[in-house]
């Protein structure tokens, strides 16, 4: 499971609690609970799979879920989003270090996951609801795309779509102005056509 986990991450099967059947006994024995934080599902799932050595994958559907909230968390501006993504990346690195798995395919997935979410961090800054000044936005974006992890992961990541390759170019070039311009377009699509945005996001 551990050496193939990158495939399940890429198939979006290891991020959220749904699409899974957990052993209640396993969860209770280890005292695993959802942490008191926003985006609490991801750290919970990581805590469950941390010491798991085998999983079973089935094509059958055993339950359905419904989710409803007043506002999508992906559409809201969050001043600490970048810090949260940095924290998540640390969790992924820690998980793979704990597993003793450092092969090229796994590390590429971890790096690609990180840089794809950097795009979201930049879009968060160009979001119309962002309260930063124009110069404040430039400074924040410069910090995001020029960070140590960003530069390292951009070298390791191999985007799977032409769209994502194109989106990452300004970030690779460390070009703040072009990155901001591109991100404003993304923000516009996100705010005006959420269905199109979700479709494009799914095809990244």
Residue ranges: model-predicted function:
Residues 60-69, 75-101, 120, 124, ...:
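Catalytic core of nucleotide-sugar-dependent glycosyltransferases
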Residues 109-123:
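Amphipathic alpha-helical repeat scaffolds of TPR domains
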Residues 34, 99-105:
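Inter-helical turn/loop segments and adjacent helix faces that build the functional surface
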Residues 1-81:
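Donor-binding/catalytic cores of nucleotide-activated saccharide
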Residues 1-4, 88, 114, 137:
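Alpha-helical structural motif
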């Amino acid at each position: 499971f551990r050496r193939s986990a990158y495939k399940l991450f890429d198939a979006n099967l290891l991020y959220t609690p749904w699409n899974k059947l957990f052993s209640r006994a396993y969860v209770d024995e280890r005292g695993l609970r959802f942490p008191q934080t926003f985006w609490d599902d991801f750290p919970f799932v990581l805590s469950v799979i941390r010491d798991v050595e085998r999983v079973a994958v089935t094509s059958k559907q055993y339950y359905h879920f419904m989710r409803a909230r007043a506002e999508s968390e992906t559409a809201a501006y969050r001043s600490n989003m970048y810090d949260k993504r940095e924290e998540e990346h640390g969790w992924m690195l820690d998980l793979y270090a704990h597993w003793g798995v450092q092969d090229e395919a796994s590390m590429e997935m971890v790096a690609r996951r990180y840089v794809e979410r950097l795009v979201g961090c930049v879009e968060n800054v160009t979001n119309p609801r962002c309260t930063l000044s124009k110069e404040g936005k430039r400074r924040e974006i410069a910090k995001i795309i020029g960070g140590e992890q960003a530069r390292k992961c951009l070298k390791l990541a191999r985007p799977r779509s032409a769209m994502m390759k194109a989106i990452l170019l300004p970030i690779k070039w460390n070009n703040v102005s072009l990155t901001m311009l591109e991100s404003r377009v993304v923000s516009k699509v996100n705010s005006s056509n959420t269905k199109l945005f979700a479709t494009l996001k799914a095809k990244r």
